Regions:
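Conserved catalytic-core segment of nucleotide-activated headgroup transferases in glycan assembly
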Residues: 175-230
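Extracellular/periplasmic catalytic domains that process cell-envelope and extracellular macromolecules
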Residues: 45-48, 84-90, 121-124, 184-188, ...
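C-terminal amphipathic helix plus adjacent low-complexity
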Residues: 2-7, 21-29, 47, 286-357
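Short, solvent-exposed loop/turn segments at secondary-structure junctions
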Residues: 59-61, 97-101, 134-137, 176-177, ...
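Eukaryotic intrinsically disordered and solvent-exposed regulatory patches
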Residues: 38-40, 78-81, 114-117, 178-182, ...
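Extended catalytic core of nucleotide-activated donor transferases of GT-like folds
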Residues: 2-7, 21-147
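Catalytic binding pocket for nucleotide-activated donors in carbohydrate/polymer assembly enzymes
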Residues: 230-323
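Catalytic core of nucleotide-activated saccharide and alditol-phosphate transferases
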Residues: 110-191
Length: 357
């Protein structure tokens, strides 16, 4: 009953946030979700009451060492989703440390194959695992099945080649000092002092960035319409918050919460966005390539009219709650939305259920 009340409350909040956007109705009402809210919320509620996960014992005692992995793993172990009965499980969790060699990982999967019946039923397709950088293809049969069939949960952005779209999931970035959730109907950002803000990051200047990215950043640093700082302290001073794909993306959720519209700078399509099965990213973010320089960037951003800007800003505030990692998971936060993505994958492979002895 409490969860149902929460679902209704969130739906009402969603509608209240969109009221000013719907003053002039359009054929398709704006929503940050790929499916209508009337579909997403009831299905989410069903997930919270029905979804079951069975976790294997790890091959050795270990702890995840990074905050996003630790948050997800601890939340999972203390959640209502775990079951001790593998026959009622929808999915199976395969825990192993990030420093496992290919040979060690192969032996672990081999042992699961030999000691339990569940892997062989689907060749691992109803299993999932956490790997910060993802795992690469390998000629070993066990590792290959894990790579190709099991759902991988990794960091965003992922290592090139280690992510399979429509199967794998990325964790929403974790920001260490999030601000309170932006209030509904936050005033329009028309008096912003800057067109865009970008966080200065040493990693963003590393060799991993393309020359086009570096050139664009250098041009922006010399343009008074863009602000730079080592920490995103007052994002309300800028209409847009700019991110280099591959750079520091930990404050994506923070930007959305305060109503700063996201701009992702990338020279290729992005297929590993967090919550990509749930959130309609084209409604909350602008994607632009770096090759046109600061002139093209300003042309794209200046071409976004007030109506579209306010719609993106409002929808970003709605979606921001799904990027918050709480010490104790709360409905619709990052942990629950990662679980919802797993829930959506429970029917990827169907098989005849029967009792296994």
């Amino acid at each position: 009953m409490a969860m149902a009340t929460t679902s209704l409350s969130l739906l009402l909040l969603f509608l209240s946030l969109l009221t000013p956007l719907l003053a002039h109705p359009t054929p398709l009402q704006p929503s940050p979700y790929l499916s209508p809210p009337t579909v997403v919320f009831p299905d989410y509620h069903k997930m919270t009451t029905h979804f079951k996960i069975y976790t294997y014992d790890p091959p050795k005692s270990f702890h995840f060492t990074t905050p996003p992995e630790t948050k997800f793993h601890n939340s999972l172990l203390n959640s209502q989703f775990l079951t001790r009965n593998p026959n009622e499980a929808h999915l199976f969790f395969v825990p192993f440390p990030h420093d496992f060699s290919t040979r060690q990982l192969s032996r672990f999967i081999r042992d699961l194959r030999q000691n339990f019946p569940y892997w062989n039923r689907t060749l691992g397709a109803d299993h999932f695992f956490v790997s910060r950088a993802g795992i690469a293809y390998a000629p070993d049969r066990n590792v290959l099945e894990l790579k190709k069939n099991a759902v991988q949960i990794s960091f965003f952005p992922t290592t090139s080649g280690n992510f399979i779209p429509h199967k794998d999931i990325t964790l929403p970035p974790l920001h260490s000092n999030p601000s309170p959730l932006a209030l509904p109907h936050a005033p329009a950002n028309k008096t912003a002092s800057f067109l865009g803000f970008m966080k200065l990051d040493v990693k963003s200047q590393s060799q991993s960035q393309s020359q086009s990215d570096k050139s664009l950043v250098q041009e922006m640093e010399g343009d008074p319409e863009f602000a730079f700082a080592s920490e995103p302290l007052d994002l309300g001073e800028s209409r847009f918050c700019l991110f280099l794909y591959g750079g520091d993306l930990t404050w994506v959720g923070e930007a959305m919460r305060v109503g700063c519209v996201l701009v992702v700078i990338t020279d290729r399509p992005i297929q590993d966005l967090p919550l990509i099965d749930v959130v309609r990213w084209s409604e909350i973010a602008v994607f632009v390539g770096p090759r046109g320089g600061v002139g093209e960037l300003k042309r794209v951003l200046s071409g976004i009219g007030d109506e579209r800007y306010e719609r993106m800003r409002g929808l970003g505030v709605v979606a921001a709650q799904h990027f918050v990692w709480n010490a104790t998971p709360q409905p619709y936060d990052a942990f629950y939305m990662v679980m919802y993505q797993l829930w959506l994958r429970r029917h990827a492979i169907r098989y005849a259920r029967r009792e296994w002895v």
